[in-house]
Regions:
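Primary recognition of N-terminal secretory signal peptides and signal-anchoring hydrophobic helices
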Residues: 5-34, 41-49, 167, 185, ...
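PDZ/PDZ-like domain segments forming the peptide/carboxylate-binding groove
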Residues: 35-38, 99-138, 142-146, 406, ...
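Stable alpha-helical elements in mature extracytoplasmic
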Residues: 41-48, 65-73, 77, 89, ...
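Structured segments of extracytoplasmic/periplasmic soluble domains
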Residues: 47-55, 68-80, 84-87, 123, ...
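Extended, small/polar residue-biased N-terminal targeting/export presequences
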Residues: 53-116, 163-165, 169-178, 186, ...
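PDZ/PDZ-like groove recognition
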Residues: 70, 107-121, 125, 197-203, ...
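Active-site-adjacent mobile loop/cap segments within catalytic or ligand-binding domains
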Residues: 339-363
Length: 484
């Protein structure tokens, strides 16, 4: 694992606001504040603070005055990425980059009957026997049925070493578990190998050793047989360390410029790399509107060098660079010092990066499109509540199912992605047409085979099966199986 050293390029994400940051070699800002008629501005501000503290009738607290003054200075810049961190906030910030938090080690989703356990990591929840599919209905003595997810998770999380009592429902029966909270390390790199030699790697943060984990996983996949295509999933990845993005680029490009940077003086200080390699198979980067900063650095570089094809939706557009500067009095100041461009001088800030293959319809169509493009020929999906498997592999993506009047409806774009069909929208008639090699169907607003809900067109599987010979499906009300 790479250590985080003073002077090393790194980048961070503020825990509270999910702010994305790039950190270059730390350097103290030049103390070049111009003197004004009123004297030294810093001394003047200090004098005002001291006079208010010592003479104001309310006997104000010096720390409170200082915090307000700091916040006012930062707000005057109009820059959402420049921030002051207290020591506690700095720790939260560092934990966010490393995907660490204090809790019991589960990924959850709010469902009508409680808090659904979607994934269990290594940690106290697994040791206590909590399983995927369990539903939390009470935390302590407080019901979480119908509660906002944020409220429920705040009850579950807490101080390390403390215990939380959970009431769960499993297969219709209630049971109680007492779990001790501890610091949880959520995996930042996971992967799986699909049939046809398609390897899939998901990176959720550019932590200090994410590049090493990706490299190790890639070598493991190679040892299992020839790789015909590699998918690197950066969706919802807010960034991390710039050095990690650079090292990851070396897995796919021999040498070059990672980014161009433009500082306050208009000078370009390019970040370069060498000693890389070129993979003998096509590489596909999955991105979306929450792929930001280091995710955009890597994607932009691989696009410019024709080393990868980006699939999904336009990225976030976080193209500025921050230094995190430790303060002598504790905490740190994160200051925007540069903007960056891709190797071919494409802007990123506030505009994002366009994918090479645009996909509409959300998570599952994005994933299936990437898998099909990489070489997976057919799909078998199984959905239990929100837990989805694709060709036998558990994935984090999911989709909503409507069950009404004895019919099962799925999003039209999910069905299209399963079948490899195209979706054409007719704005005049407000109808959607699905067409593949073995059939086609038109869904009109007044038709019986579709429903429009929350802006999404859902289509009846029983009706679709009459038009698409390759479609197979079954639904017992709990588990939906869908193939094509």
């Amino acid at each position: 694992m790479k250590s985080i050293r003073k002077g090393k390029m790194w980048r961070r994400t503020a825990a509270a606001a999910l702010t994305l940051t790039l950190i270059l070699p730390a350097a103290l800002p030049a103390a070049a504040a111009a003197l004004t008629v009123g004297g030294n501005p810093a001394e003047r501000a200090k004098e005002v603070l001291e006079k208010l503290e010592s003479q104001h009738v309310s006997a104000p607290d010096a720390k409170k005055l200082s915090d307000v003054a700091i916040q006012a200075m930062i707000e005057s810049l109009g820059d959402p990425y420049t921030q002051y961190f207290t020591p506690e906030e700095l720790t939260e910030f560092e934990n966010a980059v490393a995907n660490r938090y204090v809790g019991i080690g589960v990924r959850v989703s709010q469902q009508p009957d409680g808090v659904y356990i979607a994934e269990v990591f290594d940690g106290p929840a697994r040791e206590a026997g909590i399983r995927v599919g369990d539903v939390i209905v009470k935390v302590g003595e407080q019901s979480v049925v119908g509660a906002p997810l944020g409220e429920a998770t705040s009850l579950i999380m807490g101080e390390p070493g403390t215990e939380v009592k959970l009431r769960l429902v499993r297969d219709g029966a209630e049971l109680e578990k007492t779990v001790k909270r501890q610091q949880i390390q959520v995996p930042v790199v996971t992967g799986k190998r699909f049939e046809g030699g398609v390897a899939y790697v998901r990176v959720t943060s550019f932590s200090s050793d994410a590049d090493e984990q990706v490299a190790a996983l890639l070598e493991y996949f190679k040892s299992q047989g020839e790789i015909k295509g590699l998918i690197v999933d950066l969706r919802d990845n807010p960034g991390g360390l710039l050095d990690t993005a650079k090292e990851m680029a070396r897995l796919f490009v021999k040498e070059g410029t990672l980014i161009h940077t433009k500082n306050r003086n208009g000078l370009d200080e390019p970040v370069t790399f060498s000693g890389g390699e070129v993979q003998p198979f096509p590489v596909y980067m999955m991105v979306n509107g929450s792929s930001a900063s280091a995710s955009e650095v890597l994607t932009g570089a691989l696009q410019d060098y024709k080393a990868a094809i980006a699939i999904g939706t336009k990225t976030y557009g976080k193209g500025s660079v921050q230094n995190v500067i430790p303060l002598d009095q504790g905490g740190a100041l994160k200051v925007t010092v540069e903007e960056y461009l891709t190797p071919h001088q494409r802007p990123v800030n506030r505009v994002g990066l366009e994918p090479d293959i645009a996909v509409e319809g959300g998570q599952v169509p994005e994933l299936l499109t990437a898998l099909r493009t990489a070489g997976v020929g057919s799909f078998s999906l199984e959905l239990r509540r929100i837990n989805l498997t694709v060709n036998g592999h558990a994935v984090e993506d999911s989709f909503r199912v409507l069950r009404e009047g004895g019919q099962t409806y799925v999003p039209a774009r999910v069905l299209a992605a399963v079948l490899g069909a195209k979706v054409a929208w007719d704005a005049v008639t407000s109808s959607a047409k699905l067409q593949s090699q073995d059939g086609s169907i038109v869904y009109a607003p007044s038709g019986t085979g579709s429903k429009l809900q929350d802006g999404v067109t859902y289509v009846s599987l029983s009706q679709a099966a009459e038009f698409f010979r390759s479609l197979t499906w079954s639904d017992d009300g709990q588990v939906l199986k869908l193939g094509g």
